[in-house]
């Protein structure tokens, strides 16, 4: 902990002002990151468009589209395809969130 002497009457105040400024900057950047994370989505699809899944930032399935070709798939294969694409989309959304948060977590948010 720093100690300030009588010869440095404003040193403590200056340090505190700088600290408050830094904290405010981190708060603003955190809010911006939160807003960006809230808009993250990721979509994965089969090549033929039979199945299209979309997830949010947490990897939660938010949309599932089954094209005409999906009717040709056996039920077990369709279920496996939905699960596989959901995992792929969730990995993509997690990577997006990580890229958004990296500047805040690197070097203590400086």
Describe the residue ranges of each PLM region.
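Acidic, negatively charged sequence signal
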Residues: 1-45, 52, 65, 69-72, ...
């Amino acid at each position: 902990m720093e100690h300030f002497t009588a010869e440095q009457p404003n040193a403590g105040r200056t340090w505190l002002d700088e600290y408050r400024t830094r904290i405010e900057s981190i708060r603003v950047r955190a809010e911006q990151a939160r807003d960006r994370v809230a808009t993250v989505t990721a979509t994965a699809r089969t090549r033929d468009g039979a199945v299209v899944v979309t997830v949010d930032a947490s990897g939660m399935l938010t949309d599932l589209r089954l094209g005409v070709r999906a009717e040709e798939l056996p039920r077990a294969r369709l279920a496996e395809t939905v699960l596989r694409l959901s995992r792929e989309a969730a990995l993509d959304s997690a990577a997006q969130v990580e890229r958004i948060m990296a500047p805040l977590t690197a070097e203590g948010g400086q």
